[in-house]
Amino acid sequence: MKDGRILTEEDYAKDYSVPVPDELLHTVHVGEVTKEKIRLSCDGKTDVIQMNPHQIVTTHLVEEVPTENGYFKSDGVYNKICVVERHGKTGEIGVAPLKGFGVKGGAVATSVAHDSHNLIVAGDNDEDILAAIKGVEENQGGYVIASGGKVVDVLPLPICGLMSEK
């Protein structure tokens, strides 16, 4: 249906696209994110986010996690997850150990994150986490995979950081 009328096969061949307003194409503003900003100091037990297979619901755990020089260090069991405020308002970054994700040698980031649509990234090392964050910002949203300190794949979603122009 378009304009109250049922569409025919011929109608589907028509281009119904409309220009996207510029302000909807520039909505990812994370500012400078550094290793220092995503470090998580911990000594002893700390809060952990446990992923549950095939579920959107997570579980809160308190566990002893691996550390190096007083900071959390990812290993084969625990990855790091960061939530980065991406609307350019507060610059807040939340960091926690994530159990059950299992990424090795990389990071995955996205700007599609209901309810706030902030940038979420999970990975096993800071270089890839930072590269993935930068990749999402450079593409003004979407999904990014980083490995070896660089972006290796991207699905750009530049309309409000949530939708494709195509």
Residue positions per predicted region:
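Active-site microenvironment of metallo-dependent hydrolases
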Residues: 1-166
